[in-house]
Amino acid sequence: MADSVRFPCMPFPPCFLVCTRDDIYEDEHGRQWVAAKVETSSHSPYCSKIETCVTVHLWQMTTLFQEPSPDSLKTFNFLPRTWRLESRNTYRGADAMHWRLVNHSQFYGTEELVLMLDSR
C-alpha cells in the first residue's frame, strides 16, 4: 500500500484587510500583514499584456517592527487603505480599484498574498 503525500492545509485568504499603519494591514481575524514588496514592471510573470504591472506582496507576520521604515512611507503610500475580497480571486480597494489575487501560498511558515492591480 503506497503512502499518500500530504500537503499543509492553506487557510482561505482574508476577507478584508484594513491599513493600521503605513505598511501594515490587519485582517478579520486580527492577523497582521506587512506590505513586504511592491513591484512596478512592464515585464512581470503575472502580466500577460504589454503594460505597466503593479504587484504587491503581503506577508502575514506574527512579530512586527515597532516603527515603519522611512522608505516604506514613500513606497507604499499609494496602496488602498482597505481591501475587500469580492470574489474568489479579486479584491476591491477602498479607491474602487480591482486587485487580482495571483498567489496565496506559504513558504517556511510565512503566508503570502500577491495582489496585482487589474487594469479593467
Swiss-Prot record:
**SUPFAM superfamilies named in the record:** Oncogene products
Q: Name one Pfam family in it.
A: TCL1_MTCP1
Q: State a single Gene Ontology molecular function.
A: protein serine/threonine kinase activator activity
Family label: Belongs to the TCL1 family.
Name of the protein in question: Protein TCL1B4
Organism (species):
Mus musculus
